[in-house]
């Protein structure tokens, strides 16, 4: 696709604890929840609460959840991100393709340092967040901008959003089609996206519009009528109002209205992780079963060939 030996692509995912243990989860959450892009409460107020109450309470509980989805080679997010970067490398043999995490290891800044030390003079940073948000993509952008100021000899570009990129949309639609061909089609398809606080959207974060655009584009690619799919938001944290409709209560309402088989896909997540596997595939399925309905979870794209091809094309296009 491109002959550029001094060019690298760095695929950046959110991050994961190194092990499914309370100490590892505590280290990870401490970094993640200390990012002002994630929690905007002033540090003088937030840090005592975080370290004195939230981390002691959440670390063990979260570790138990991670243990339920952990793979032999590590956390699903890490395993699939690594495999995805390897698949992209196979498609871009004249470039260097690596992966990094915004929180945890391999750290974003360290991987940029390594690529520069190895001779990269152009680096494409590809956050694995299809829909731009100030809580995710912008946090990566902050780190990249700070690194760029310290390393003016390297040109860094960043893919900010690919929520309606045709290659990515078709990759998601194709994965859903294949699932339906093998397993049959449910009565309704739910697109479940990670939520953000409503106040961020009110303040101008375009994330909900990006999610809606993604859902519409995928539904159109599948030929779905407007009454054959829904959108919801999951993973609410804290007590404030987040984006609505909330996914799980929406699923309950479908079950209570007589819908007995519901398919759920999470196109805001590039790879499967705790939120898709434990919260959705396990948790949503269980609570829907209690209401007499069956939920089938359609996996994320992970390292599927169509996913790697779509992201490789995005990286190359950003170099034009």
UniProtKB/Swiss-Prot annotation:
The keyword Transferase does not apply. Fe cation binds at residues 194, 275. One of its GO terms (biological process) is heme biosynthetic process. Keywords: Cytoplasm, Heme biosynthesis, Iron, Lyase, Metal-binding, Porphyrin biosynthesis. Its EC number is 4.98.1.1. GO terms for cellular component: cytoplasm. Pathway: Porphyrin-containing compound metabolism; protoheme biosynthesis; protoheme from protoporphyrin-IX: step 1/1. Its main location: cytoplasm. Catalyzes the ferrous insertion into protoporphyrin IX. PANTHER family: FERROCHELATASE, FERROCHELATASE, MITOCHONDRIAL. Belongs to the ferrochelatase family. This is Ferrochelatase. It comes from Stenotrophomonas maltophilia (strain R551-3). The lineage of its organism: Bacteria, Pseudomonadati, Pseudomonadota, Gammaproteobacteria, Lysobacterales. The gene is hemH.
């Amino acid at each position: 696709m491109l002959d550029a030996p001094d060019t690298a692509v760095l695929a950046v995912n959110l991050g994961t604890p190194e092990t499914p243990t309370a100490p590892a989860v505590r280290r990870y959450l401490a970094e993640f929840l200390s990012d002002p892009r994630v929690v905007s409460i002033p540090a003088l107020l937030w840090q005592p609460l975080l370290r004195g109450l939230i981390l002691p309470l959440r670390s063990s509980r979260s570790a138990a959840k991670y243990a339920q989805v952990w793979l032999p080679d590590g956390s699903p997010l890490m395993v699939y991100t690594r495999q995805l970067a390897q698949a992209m490398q196979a498609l871009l043999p004249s470039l260097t393709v690596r992966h990094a995490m915004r929180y945890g290891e391999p750290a974003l800044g360290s991987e940029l340092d390594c690529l520069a030390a190895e001779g990269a003079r152009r680096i494409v940073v590809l956050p694995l967040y299809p829909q731009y948000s100030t809580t995710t993509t912008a946090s990566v952008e902050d780190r990249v901008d700070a690194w760029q100021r310290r390393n003016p000899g390297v040109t860094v570009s960043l893919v900010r959003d690919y929520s309606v990129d045709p290659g990515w949309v078709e990759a998601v639609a194709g994965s859903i089609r294949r699932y339906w061909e093998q397993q049959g089609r449910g009565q309704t398809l739910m697109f479940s996206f990670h939520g953000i606080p409503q106040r961020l959207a009110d303040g101008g974060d375009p994330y909900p519009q990006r999610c809606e655009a993604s859902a519409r584009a995928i539904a159109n690619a599948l030929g779905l009528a407007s009454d054959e799919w829904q959108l919801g938001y999951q993973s609410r944290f804290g007590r404030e109002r987040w984006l609505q409709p909330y996914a799980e209560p929406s699923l309950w309402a479908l079950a209570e209205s007589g819908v007995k088989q519901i398919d759920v896909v999470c196109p805001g997540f590039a790879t499967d992780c705790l939120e898709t596997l434990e919260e959705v595939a396990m948790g949503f399925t269980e609570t829907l079963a209690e209401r007499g309905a069956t939920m089938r979870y359609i996996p994320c794209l992970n390292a599927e060939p169509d996913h790697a091809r779509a992201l490789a094309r995005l990286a190359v296009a950003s170099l034009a």
